Structures are given as C-alpha cells and as structure tokens.
Amino acid sequence: MNEALKSLTVTGKERYKSGVLEYKRMGYWEPDYEPKDTDVIALFRVTPQNGVDPIEASAAVAGESSTATWTVVWTDRLTAAEKYRAKCYRVDPVPNTPGSYFAYIAYDLDLFEPGSIANLSASIIGNVFGFKPLKALRLEDMRFPVAYVKTFQGPATGIVVERERLDKFGRPLLGATVKPKLGLSGRNYGRVVYEALKGGLDFTKDDENTNSQPFMHWRDRFLYCMEAVNKAQAATGEVKGTYLNVTAATMEDMYERAEFAKELGSVIIMIDLVIGYTAIQSMAKWARRNDMILHLHRAGHGTYTRQKSHGVSFRVIAKWMRLAGVDHIHAGTVVGKLEGDPNTTRGYYDICREDHNPMALEYGLFFEQHWASLNKLMPVASGGIHAGQMHQLLNYLGEDVVLQFGGGTIGHPLGIQAGATANRVALEAMILARNEGRDYVHEGPEILAKAAATCTPLKQALDVWKNVTFNYDSTDTPDFVPTAAVTA
C-alpha cells in the first residue's frame, strides 16, 4: 500500500471515532492491490454525478457491493474486514466518453455462496445500482476464478452431446419460431411445426410468451407438437425436436410441464430469462437429471443490457447463464433485426463456445476466463434473418449455432414447408462451398443463385427478401482504446 493510500485510509480507533468516512478512506480504494487468482473481478462503467470524484464513486461501488454501509460500524471489528472488503484497484477514463470511468473491483471468493447466481447478482448488481452519487452504472464484464466456476454444473447437455443425440454434424442447426406466436389453436400450431420440420428444419420453437392461454392450453400444444415431431421424423428419417416452453407462474407448474414433455418423448424444453436466476438453475438441474436439452430465451434482457451507460452487459448474462447450466441462449445475429454489433456479438459467441477466453478488448472481453471443463453453450441466432443472408451468417457465427428463421420460414410465399426447404438448401449449398475451399463470403450471392436455379422455394425466398436488411447503428459497441489511467 503506497504512502498516499496510507494517508487516505483511516484505521484503528480513529476509524471508529469518525462517524461518516469517504469510501476511499474506508479501505475500498487500494491502487496497489494485486488481484489474486481466487478473486472474483468485476468491471463497472461508472458515471458519477457532477462534482463527485470518480475514485470516490468507484470506491463507493466496491463498498456498497460488499461490506460497507453509509457510516462506520463497530461490528466491522468482529469480522476479517480487510479480507472481506471489495477493493477497487484501478480506475480508467472510458475512451471517447467524458465523465465515465471503468472501475476494476476485486472481491474475495468467500463473499459468495458456491453455485448461486442469485447470491452473486445480489451483491454485484444489488443496492449499488440505486446509489445517489452515481448518475449511471453498468456492469461490463466479470472474471470468475476456476475454484468458483467448479461450484456450478454448467450446461446440462453441451454442444458435443447435443450433436450426438441429434446425429447432426458439420453445419449449423436450423430452427424456426412458430408465427404468429399468439392466437393459434393447438391443432394449427402443430401443423406449422410439422410442415417446418418436414421441409428440412431441425427444430421449431415456442416463443417467449407462448405459455398457456385461453386459445391454446399448454397441454394441447405439447400433444399436437410432439405428434408433429414424430410424424416429421418418420417422414424424413432425421431426428427432430421442438422447444416446448415450460415457463409458468410457479416452479411446481414448470416441473409438471417439463415432466409431461419428457413423457411425450421430447428431447428439448425451453424457459425464459424472466423466470429468474434461481428458477433457471433449478430447471437446469432438472434437465441434467432427465437428459433433456434446455433452451433459454433471453426475454427481457434488453431492459438492462442495451443501454451503454447503465445496466448489465449481455456478456455478463452469457457468462452467468453458462454457469447456471442452460444449453442454448439467444446471442444475436449481427445481420438481423435485433441489437448486435459484429465485434460485440463475436465476444458473446466466444463466451458460449470456448473452453478458454483470452482477454480480447476488441470483442469487449476485458478479462481472461477459464471455463474449467464446463460444457459449451450453444448460441442461437434469431430475429429478422433469411436465406439470402446464409453466407453472412456462416461467416459471422460459425457452425456451432442454431439459426432460427421464423418469419423467414413461415412467411415464405409458397408456404411453411417451402420456406423450410429454402433455408435447408441455402445452408447445404453454403456448407458445400465452404468445404470445397471456396470464398463463400464473397461468392455467397452467386452460390445461392446457382442453388436456386434447381430449387424453386429458394428462388422465391431470394426474390421476396433480397432487399431486406436492418442496417442500424448498434448502441452497444466495445470501448477498447488504451488510455492513461487516472490512478497513475
């Protein structure tokens, strides 16, 4: 600890005579601290109120997310306070964003309950996000020590075992969300599933708010969907599936629906992010016990991940969900209708699919992360994608991904089955070109046009959606330009 810091930090009896101290004088600011391999590290984007010292604001974040309260308390002397205080050890200005700072904060591993996302999030994104001296606060990234990672089960099935169960290798998986997502009867819903699977898709899925409504009870949907899956498997000779959304009001209801899906022979169930971290982990444990693939729809994430100055980055949510144990997560498309900067999305996909993430600031990854043999998490791309973008999707997202063409299947002018066939032919043509060593990225339109010459459904798809793009600036791009630290 340097001399300047010693003069700031009040210790001993003087500390308990002081009443209210600045957080940086209470030990939450330690610029000489070297994080331990066993520390949990969080990176916050801190925007202090006008006139608030950025170091004091960052120290306050460390304090309020660990052991501090607004005044000095005598009971600190009954604990290993030096050990349990979170330590802000670095504060850097955010490039090209005056008034905002990156605060690096280390937390002792003993501050967290093993294997609990609920406990982790209660500390890291709890009361501190309502702290008055802060104009805005965003959790940008986290690093978890291997000792902590090993307390979680990780994805229940994982990419390798999922591909083995489906007997599908060497290409992205194809899916579609049933549209319209609300209003169909169970019988008509099942018809959509059958036609899409028979046409060449691997999966269909419920949407986030397809639960159990007056027009379609969940049990009816499950029965008609699994009848469709079984008929499509018999017709094509391929393993098929449909994501049956078991999201409900209570855990008891969700377990009941999941058990019924299992009884019907489903290989996969689905939940929504909005059910909460404890429910997600509970369903992940159920899925592992029952050999079921678990799909997570990230419904609701945009309320706190999209704004660059306040909230939680989706890269953090992706890390939490890999720990929690889901097998699929929607992670962006780059070219679709939903938020997704190419570099930022690449970072999300690397979090899901790699055994080890090196620090890669250009992708928004501020820390090296070892995943300690946890299974890999299959990212899902959905929202405004179509067959004409197949070369771009393969280039940006790789082959370990589920490409979900909802409107791009069900909106086909020749019908649902034709829409599915168009997507399957486009994918197979692009994979063949890649395997032959062709420059499929630049030759993509030519490859698709050649395939369409002998496939009317693909030709129709290319004609209908050839001019459909979603070229909007992303609101969440990486900030990685090196700058001088204010801690120097």
Curated annotation (Swiss-Prot):
Protein's name in the database: Ribulose bisphosphate carboxylase large chain 1
BP GO terms, sorted: reductive pentose-phosphate cycle
Function as written in the Swiss-Prot or TrEMBL entry: RuBisCO catalyzes two reactions: the carboxylation of D-ribulose 1,5-bisphosphate, the primary event in carbon dioxide fixation, as well as the oxidative fragmentation of the pentose substrate. Both reactions occur simultaneously and in competition at the same active site.
Family from the record: Belongs to the RuBisCO large chain family. Type I subfamily.
Catalysed reactions, semicolon-separated: 2 (2R)-3-phosphoglycerate + 2 H(+) = D-ribulose 1,5-bisphosphate + CO2 + H2O; D-ribulose 1,5-bisphosphate + O2 = 2-phosphoglycolate + (2R)-3-phosphoglycerate + 2 H(+)
Cofactor: Mg(2+)
Site residues by UniProt (Transition state stabilizer): 337
Entry-linked InterPro entries: RuBisCO, RuBisCo_large_chain_AS, RuBisCO_lsu_C, RuBisCO_lsu_C_sf, RuBisCO_lsu_fd_N, RuBisCO_lsu_N_sf, RuBisCO_lsuI
Keywords, in A-Z order: Calvin cycle, Carbon dioxide fixation, Lyase, Magnesium, Metal-binding, Monooxygenase, Oxidoreductase, Photosynthesis
A GO molecular-function annotation: magnesium ion binding
Gene that produces this protein: cbbL1
Cofactor note: Binds 1 Mg(2+) ion per subunit.
Organism, as annotated: Bradyrhizobium sp. (strain BTAi1 / ATCC BAA-1182)
Keyword Nucleotidyltransferase: no
NCBIfam families associated with the record: PRK04208.1
Modified-residue entries (N6-carboxylysine), positions: 205
Note, other: The basic functional RuBisCO is composed of a large chain homodimer in a 'head-to-tail' conformation. In form I RuBisCO this homodimer is arranged in a barrel-like tetramer with the small subunits forming a tetrameric 'cap' on each end of the 'barrel'.
Residues holding substrate: 127, 177, 181, 298, 330, 382
Keyword Secreted included in the entry's annotation: no
Binding residue positions for Mg(2+): 205, 207-208
Self-association and partners: Heterohexadecamer of 8 large chains and 8 small chains.
Signal peptide: none
HAMAP family: RuBisCO_L_type1
